[in-house]
Amino acid sequence: MLSPLIRRYTWNSTWLYYIRIFIALCGTTALPWWLGDVKLTIPLTLGMVAAALTDLDDRLAGRLRNLIITLICFFIASASVELLFPWPWLFALGLTLSTSGFILLGGLGQRYATIAFGALLIAIYTMLGTSLYDHWYQQPLLLLAGAVWYNLLTLTGHLLFPLRPLQDNLARSYEQLAHYLELKSRLFDPDIEDESQAPLYDLALANGQLMATLNQTKVSLLTRLRGDRGQRGTRRTLHYYFVAQDIHERASSSHIQYQTLRDYFRHSDVMFRFQRLMSMQAQACTQLARCILLRTPYQHDPRFERVFTHIDAALERMRASGASLELLNTLGFLLTNLRAIDAQLATIESEQAQAMPRNESENQLADDSLHGFSDIWLRLSRNFTPESALFRHAVRMSLVLCIGYALIQITGMRHGYWILLTSLFVCQPNYNATRHRLALRIIGTLVGVAIGLPILWFVPSLEGQLVLLVITGVLFFAFRNVQYAHATMFITLLVLLCFNLLGEGFEVALPRVGDTLIGCAIAWAAVSFIWPDWRFRNLPRVLQRATDANCRYLDAILEQYHQGRDNRLAYRIARRDAHNRDAELASVVSNMSSEPDVTAETREAAFRLLCLNHTFTSYISALGAHREKLSNPDVLGLLDDAVCYVDDALHHQPEDEQRVHQALEGLKQRVQSLETRPDSKEPLVVQQIGLLIALLPEIGRLQRQISPPISTLITQP
């Protein structure tokens, strides 16, 4: 009993992270106390906080490279503030250029975006403490010392648990997969009637979250594969990742319109049986995620075999009672798909399953990292236009920080640089995220000040305040990604305690509230009036990218029905791109729900388009999940023509409407009249073609409703 408990907490990354933060804060507070110079606590702690906020997962060589880049950026940002601080005009110019430059650097990838944010944070932390030291280099070096201290702890943790972040990402992937399967199971609820589109909307949003987690896992895998491709631990996680991708394709598959199933089988238990089976598979994915975290073997639930047996019996009973043969065949395809998911889960721990595929292409991952200066320039140049969200964010942040700095210079506020700090954290690249953070930041600050003042009064001792500083710092990082208001409250307490070490705790408390309100107001004005997102939303272009990706996915599947099934890199890229574009569309439509200047008609059309696109992708996924080489030339010919028709129907000009309609009618007749072998995958292929082309007229109508002509889209930058 003791061993599992110890394992649970020893291998719990969250607790290990909290311990690392605790040790780091103990170091930044205990050393100054031991030296008798508590003023050192402020730059050391702030440097450590900035380093923790920019912590990046990578292999050892990558972490060392990230550390060097981070320290260089931190020193440049901090030293620039110290050197330019006496000259306001030069300082404002430097603030503008550095802010826009650092943010645009994020166009090179998430690593550089994170480091750039940390550099801006260090710059503002330096502004808060410019009066602490006489020489310009003292505070920058102390801030760097705090950053180095935290990174030393991080490197130590990496040496002890090198694969831990990768396993965390992999476990989160299976948790998100479980969530997706659970939501998918709700589509089999026979009591859904009027709100039949709501579960599809939730499913599309969940798919976006799952794809984001899978993409993050892929990045973690790539960093490890560059250095230790042959190691068993990395090979094992790579196998788990490929299984997650395959389960996702099967889980996202749709074999019929769910409303048709619900209407026909409303008073039968078969819908509940399928719902329970998918719910059990969701629980199995959750259990697998837990096993990955605890590094214990996954044991597949033996009850699955009984569940499959009972579903087979239920389908046979319905077949004997004269139920629709077409619908029963569809349920049979669905059951085959769910059996394949079960087989993946049941054999995931098998040594044979974890062996490398013979085809090297099936073991490769798409590498999206930088490749040479031409690639660097290409990625940067893409963001030199207002069409880029990153460019708009860079311009907004530059103006926000300059306005805040100008306000400080005009009013002479002593601690006014908290305005800049608030704006940096609150002002996000899009309107919805900024609005959400704005309210939480204000609430957290008000509560933090209300709690902080009595604490400063009742805990006057230096040692007591240092202990509280450590506690509030740990709690800030604990709540940072789950409860932003709580995190703001604790960071407010930390700041009050830091300045109280200089005897200024009571003096800065109320100004902190005012600065927060001003910083939030500036951030809100920026996202509302400086190139607001809804003017650049361009739903037609996002939809165009989604339909293009679906067409490429269909092409990749078509190739495998001709040549045979495999998991080559090109196929997996096409599949991932289709789901990523579906996730992008879900994000845009979700943001539209709370943006101003969106008519109810546009919002409803966008919502319906999202549901249709996700359904369309799920029909394609079903073709992909069941892909195998076919020999019937009539079925292959129909599939070839259907793929060409889908591409044509989604990209045609208005004057071609009649031709496209005639082609649709011709395909429908071929689908209805084609003879197929019932003991093969041919009926499923024909069925999925029918489902795909049935959606195209409504998709086309909604496309025309929200889109300019195709020629306009092509000429736009």
Give the residues covered by each predicted segment:
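Elongated alpha-helical scaffolds
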Residues: 95-99, 242-250, 616
